[in-house]
């Protein structure tokens, strides 16, 4: 028996319309965005863009394992054979709950541990960048 092999996609949600927060790298997402609602939205995008064949390929394996509204990052699990289909569906999402968004896949990993470590490293670097922005500039 062959074990189920999957890929984990670390993605971030960007808000292009938020000009008041333009200096900061990430903007928190709405707290109403949950893992289950994201899964439904991604499945809908697969069905709209790739039809019954596309949804048949990814339906059993597509799950959002993690989503943080504070950092607007998430981890999506999908079968290794069809991860590019899920990636394309993520990129095609243009709106979440009425707000225009851009979803960018940051990393593709074979294990959830490596995807989590990549998310932690991204968060650490963003905290460092924000702390550098908040320091006063001496002239």
UniProtKB/Swiss-Prot annotation:
Protein name listed in UniProt: Ribonuclease P/MRP protein subunit POP5
Function: Component of ribonuclease P, a protein complex that generates mature tRNA molecules by cleaving their 5'-ends. Also a component of RNase MRP, which cleaves pre-rRNA sequences.
Top-level lineage group: Eukaryota
Secreted among keywords: no
Record-listed E.C. numbers: 3.1.26.5
Keywords of this entry: Hydrolase, Nucleus, tRNA processing
Reactions catalysed according to its record: Endonucleolytic cleavage of RNA, removing 5'-extranucleotides from tRNA precursor
Chief subcellular location: nucleus
InterPro entries assigned: Pop5/Rpp14/Rnp2-like, RNase_P/MRP_POP5, Rnp2-like_sf
GO molecular function, one term: ribonuclease P RNA binding
One Pfam family per UniProt: RNase_P_Rpp14
Top-level enzyme category: hydrolase
Keyword rRNA-binding: no
GO BP of this protein: endonucleolytic cleavage in ITS1 to separate SSU-rRNA from 5.8S rRNA and LSU-rRNA from tricistronic rRNA transcript (SSU-rRNA, 5.8S rRNA, LSU-rRNA); tRNA 5'-leader removal; tRNA processing
Localization: Nucleus
GO cellular component: multimeric ribonuclease P complex; nucleolar ribonuclease P complex; nucleolus; ribonuclease MRP complex
Family matches, as SUPFAM superfamilies: Rnp2-like
Family: Belongs to the eukaryotic/archaeal RNase P protein component 2 family.
């Amino acid at each position: 028996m062959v074990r189920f092999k999957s890929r984990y996609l670390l993605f971030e949600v960007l808000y292009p319309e938020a000009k008041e927060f333009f200096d900061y790298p990430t903007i928190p997402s709405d707290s109403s965005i949950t893992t289950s609602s994201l899964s439904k939205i991604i499945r809908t995008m697969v069905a709209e863009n790739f039809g019954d064949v596309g949804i048949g390929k990814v339906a059993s394996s597509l799950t959002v394992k993690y989503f943080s509204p504070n950092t607007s990052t998430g981890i999506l699990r999908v079968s290794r054979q069809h991860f590019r289909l899920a990636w394309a569906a993520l990129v095609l999402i243009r709106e979440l709950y009425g707000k225009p968004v851009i979803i960018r896949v940051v990393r593709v990993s074979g294990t959830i541990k490596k995807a989590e470590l990549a998310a932690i490293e991204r968060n650490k670097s963003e905290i460092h960048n924000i702390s550098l922005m908040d320091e006063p500039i001496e002239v």
